[in-house]
């Protein structure tokens, strides 16, 4: 099947009429934006423009559904948004993306949605896309699993057998995760048990327990545990299966979207608009409209903060679990079971985010496009003990943190010849809760003083990698968990949705299809987090809403391939 193409003036590729045998062809007569805004009914309303919601929106619009996305922020993308400060561009939620190699899952989704040709990704330093910075040395993690294993053995020769055994188990569990994704019944579960017992018997055990089984060297344990920051749970708590999923995601290296994280929602929104879909910014949903009672409950649309009602056959919430169930749905429409479940739900970790612009000579410092995991002590769990401390001290060294030189990843982001950096430290929302009722930009002097003290602590940590940074700053701005609440509407400033603990993954995840007919849920509070995880939940939501197969949602790869540079 060949599609005619219309090329819009904004250089976003606009394919012609999408097709599927299961659903109707979109009308040839395109409606104007003004007419679309006057429509009484949509097929699907998506609440929130995070990457999961946009994935579902594009998938459904490709299949002929009329989709409206409503976003409370003035920037689309949720944690994949980018913003500017004094002309410098920052992307707080995306620092690298994996599985963009041929056959990679992330690539499959972007290309399958028909937006591959609109995206270019830049490879992080292949000989060290992640740098683990100790006080006395730096260990570089290279792209390619076998290269990584060989480098570990070279650095820790006495741990050779443990390293080999550990990665053998990781490969087995990774294979089991692939199989587990296709489980549909008891026979599939039995097949998984028989063919991949490694995941059955190890998947829910704490990652640190598995690592301790194979490894004795404290520094090596740190290297194997430190990227827990990519899922935000202590190695002592995170299920090994999730730890493997995150590690395996980057076995072939990492990439960064050219133009910043916002390039991804931009491509998806361009496709959505070409399919007669629409996104409305600064549009806050007050609540979801539900008709009927008991088993007859059905979502029929939304009511906005200004009182306007918009009707739709289906509503998909891309908001987090607490916003969705505690704020958008009237309690009388929820069962006691789901109400109790939400009340016990644990949010993921929060963080401080430091955004910098500097006139330092980055070349002279030898900094590259890789990420820097800075460890002041070898105990990775100390990072998470700090994050659980509601009495966050204003002074002292952070046990660990994360730094990225974003203009090294994408030189097109340079402004006025300055380099930009982003740094992050996990902290507790509780330490900032006393200021939660104050307005952003109008908070008290003690809040601003606390921020300044924390900024200095972070700069001291960063100076291990970037000496004299504090004397070469042209821009320095700190975001707190309250910033996360304001811009991303995340419960208690969480950055990964629900905590992916033993009780909240696998069978414990919140469902895509809710107990209310016509109401669905996707994003980081459901099955998975991160760019790929959230997109995967969007694909699952589109499948269930359209009642179609996975390959039908991702049937548009011929529209173009991702460029890797």
Task: Locate the predicted segments by residue.
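N-terminal glycine-rich phosphate/pyrophosphate-binding loop and immediately adjacent elements
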Residues: 38-172, 498-499
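Rossmann-like flavin
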Residues: 134-238
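A glycine-rich dinucleotide-binding beta-alpha-beta segment and adjacent secondary-structure elements
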Residues: 217-231, 398-404, 459, 463-528
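Helical element adjacent to the flavin cofactor pocket in flavoenzyme catalytic cores
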Residues: 244-299
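Mid-domain catalytic core of redox enzymes
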Residues: 256, 286-415, 562
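Active-site-proximal substrate-binding core of FAD-dependent oxidoreductases
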Residues: 290, 547-565
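C-terminal segments that line or cap access tunnels to active or ligand-binding sites in enzymes
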Residues: 360-479
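A conserved FAD-binding loop/helix module that cradles the flavin
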Residues: 526-545
């Amino acid at each position: 099947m060949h599609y005619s193409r219309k090329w819009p003036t904004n250089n976003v590729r606009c394919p012609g009429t999408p097709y599927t045998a299961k659903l109707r062809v979109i009308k040839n007569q395109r409606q104007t934006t003004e007419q679309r805004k006057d429509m009484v009914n949509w097929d699907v309303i998506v609440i929130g423009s995070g990457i999961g919601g946009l994935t579902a929106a594009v998938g459904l619009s490709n299949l002929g559904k009329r989709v409206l996305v409503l976003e409370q922020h003035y920037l689309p993308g949720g944690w994949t948004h980018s913003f500017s400060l004094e002309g410098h561009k920052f992307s707080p939620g995306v620092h690298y993306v994996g599985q963009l190699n041929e056959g990679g899952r992330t690539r499959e989704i972007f290309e399958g949605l028909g937006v591959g040709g609109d995206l270019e990704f830049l490879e992080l330093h292949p000989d060290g896309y992640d740098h683990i910075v100790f006080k006395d040395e730096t260990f570089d993690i290279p792209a390619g699993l076998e290269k990584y294993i060989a480098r570990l053995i070279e650095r820790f020769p006495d741990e050779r057998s443990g390293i080999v055994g550990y990665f053998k188990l990781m490969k087995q569990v990774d294979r089991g995760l692939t199989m587990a994704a296709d489980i549909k019944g008891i026979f599939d579960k039995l097949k998984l048990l028989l063919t991949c017992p490694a995941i059955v018997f190890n998947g829910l055990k704490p990652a640190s327990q598995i690592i301790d089984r194979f490894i004795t060297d404290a520094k090596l344990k740190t290297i194997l545990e430190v990227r827990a920051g990519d899922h935000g749970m202590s190695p002592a708590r995170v299920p090994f299966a999730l730890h493997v999923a995150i590690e395996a995601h980057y076995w072939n290296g990492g990439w960064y979207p050219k133009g910043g994280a916002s390039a991804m929602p931009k491509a998806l929104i361009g496709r959505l608009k070409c399919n007669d879909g629409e996104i409305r910014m600064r549009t806050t949903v007050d609540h979801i409209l539900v008709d009927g009672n008991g088993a007859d409950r059905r979502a029929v649309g939304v009511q906005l903060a200004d009182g306007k009602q918009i009707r739709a056959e289906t509503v998909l919430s891309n908001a987090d679990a607490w916003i969705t169930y505690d704020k958008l749905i009237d309690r009388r429409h929820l069962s006691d079971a789901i109400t109790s479940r939400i009340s016990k739900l644990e949010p993921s970790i929060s963080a401080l985010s430091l955004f910098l612009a500097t006139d330092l000579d980055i070349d002279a410092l030898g900094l590259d496009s890789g990420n820097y995991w800075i460890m002041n002590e070898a105990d990775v769990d100390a990072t998470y003990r700090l994050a659980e401390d509601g009495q966050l001290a204003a002074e002292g060294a952070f046990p660990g943190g994360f730094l990225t030189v974003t203009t090294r990843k994408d030189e097109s982001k340079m402004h006025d010849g300055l380099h930009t950096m982003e740094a992050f430290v996990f902290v507790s929302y509780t330490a900032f809760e006393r200021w939660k009722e104050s307005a952003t930009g109008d908070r008290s002097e003690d809040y601003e003083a606390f921020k300044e003290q924390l900024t200095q602590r972070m700069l001291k940590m960063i100076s291990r990698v970037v000496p004299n940074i504090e004397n070469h700053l042209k821009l320095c701005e700190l975001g707190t968990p309250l910033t996360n609440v304001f811009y991303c509407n995340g419960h208690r400033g969480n950055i990964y949705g629900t905590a992916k603990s033993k009780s909240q993954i696998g069978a414990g995840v919140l469902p895509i299809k809710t107990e209310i007919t016509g109401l669905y849920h996707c994003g980081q509070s459901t099955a998975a987090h991160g760019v790929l995880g959230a997109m995967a939940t969007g694909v699952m939501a589109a499948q269930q809403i359209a009642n179609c197969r996975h390959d039908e949602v991702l049937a548009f790869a011929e529209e173009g391939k991702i460029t890797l540079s």
